[in-house]
Amino acid sequence: MIKGINHITYSVSNIAKSIEFYRDILGADILVESETSAYFNLGGIWLALNEEKNIPRSEIKYSYTHIAFTISDNDFEDWYNWLKENEVNILEGRDRDIRDKKSIYFTDLDGHKLELHTGSLEDRLSYYKEAKPHMNFYI
């Protein structure tokens, strides 16, 4: 039986710059680092970065694949301003209903999409049950 997410690993093109991004911009606690890898605790999630210089990265920008982290609604504007001040690549978000809560989409230095989201799964399901009758719900 699967018990939960064990860790998330990203390949990065420059480990030193990526360590700075995740530590200094997102506030991750660095646990260990080497010349080509680093482990962090980011909101209770084990995040691993491995430097891999010669892999294609151009397709990343075409995918909606991303990792979302929870933030409070009260911190939303502060996070947005912090990312902007630090010249993080903030992406245009999708149009959303207020019941779907707020999100900031952005990329790390290698184009991996990340999201800061104020809602929960319960918020999303409640909204969808109300607004999307074409969906089948099992909970």
Swiss-Prot record:
Start and end residues of each VOC domain: 4-119
Function of the molecule: Metallothiol transferase which confers resistance to fosfomycin by catalyzing the addition of a thiol cofactor to fosfomycin. L-cysteine is probably the physiological thiol donor.
Organism superkingdom: Bacteria
Family: Belongs to the fosfomycin resistance protein family. FosB subfamily.
Active-site residues per Swiss-Prot or TrEMBL entry: 115 (proton donor/acceptor)
Required cofactor names: Mg(2+)
Entry's Gene Ontology molecular function annotations: magnesium ion binding; transferase activity, transferring alkyl or aryl (other than methyl) groups
Main location: cytoplasm
Protein name per the record: Metallothiol transferase FosB
Subcellular location: Cytoplasm
Quaternary structure and interacting proteins, as annotated: Homodimer.
Broadest EC class assigned to this enzyme: transferase
Binding site residues for Mg(2+): 7, 66, 115
InterPro entries: Fosfomycin_Res_Enzymes, Glyas_Bleomycin-R_OHBP_Dase, Glyas_Fos-R_dOase_dom, Metallothiol_Trafse_FosB, VOC
Xref: NCBIfam families: Fos_BSH (NF000493), Fos_BSH_Saur (NF000085), PRK04101.1 (NF003152)
Organism: Staphylococcus haemolyticus (strain JCSC1435)
GO process annotations (BP): response to antibiotic
Keywords per UniProt: Antibiotic resistance, Cytoplasm, Magnesium, Metal-binding, Plasmid, Transferase
Enzyme Commission (EC) number: 2.5.1.-
A Gene Ontology term for the protein's cellular component: cytoplasm
